[in-house]
């Protein structure tokens, strides 16, 4: 009789626990999605800032388009990508400090980032002053190289504005203060488009005007966020102040900043290498055009899915800082599920419209036909990128930037690019082979990061996070270790 009474009680308890777990997962998915959606607007606005400049200048001449496109590529890899990667250190430090309620450290970490990013911008600026000569050494067309060099020179003020802006973006992101960034990004973009058109066409500054307008827009965005941070009551406890702590935090900042920059730059550089290699093929104009279309489409998708990655990074970092390993694990799982849904929707839509969407870039039938043929490979690439971007966000939130950097080197430079070279030049798959090499690298990278995250001991990571941000009351009790 006693056994018959206990059995339904046990079943009811188990059912209740399952329902609670399901409810928690659903709440985590809603939390990640509610942050990811506005972050997409922030990322896309920043991306369109440079993209619209290219489009506006491109209407002047084919030479102008080629020059600004080449200049943008090298500026992104040697400058903006470096700063973007370095600021990724704040996703770990600020995110975990906020979760641990060490609010004052957000301000000091962010100030440290601003100072060092501004300092690092100086040698990058000097490098850009010699961009023309560097491009000539790389056997680029002299006219295009000269225009790209002028564009990069006038882009130098944007570099310093970007240093401040990206640090502030991570500061706000760590606190889930997304809507101020949405407003500032959209305002900057709305200001930038007419300003760029006036400077390029009305005042006839050409590429110089486009670069200058980007710098003005970045600074405008940064000033807006700075004023909000200083004036808003929501930032009282985390406010940024000039402090000597910049030297105290130097070691821990660069501990995450350098591998974070490597993660970012190695991946961006791999895509640029593929674009340059396409120029060595027999029909280089066609091959480069197709690879550029694939790269632009992939970049647009990256800025879409990166919102999910940012949300994953913030939520995982906050939960680890709060000493909540189960919350961190559930946040990571929720972000991966959302990425899976997004990847299926985007890749299947692209595949089903493979004979239509290429017309958004070109009216040349030869280009349309080639892009249609390469679309299935591009769909696999987008499928992998969705997971990879979110997994990379989890890596940054946890503080595994070194692991991410090593995985990037192995995936792209030991496997991906060599496979692309083999398929392209030895087996004569041309541009398809180059892009297939990238897909091979991103697939391997995705699988490795899946394994790393799948076998993670989240309890240990929570303890590391609490120790990292200097919390004296590190949670080592049984609830943390279970």
Curated annotation (Swiss-Prot):
Annotated Gene Ontology cellular component terms: membrane
Domain of life: Eukaryota
Location, primary (coarse class): membrane
UniProt keyword list: Membrane, Transmembrane, Transmembrane helix, Transport
Localization: Membrane
InterPro entries for this protein: MATE_euk, MATE_fam
Listed GO MF terms: antiporter activity; xenobiotic transmembrane transporter activity
Membrane topology, from the record: Multi-pass membrane protein
Pfam family membership, one: MatE
NCBIfam families in the record: matE (TIGR00797)
Name recorded for this polypeptide: Protein DETOXIFICATION 9
Species the sequence originates in: Arabidopsis thaliana
Taxonomic placement: Eukaryota, Viridiplantae, Streptophyta, Embryophyta, Tracheophyta
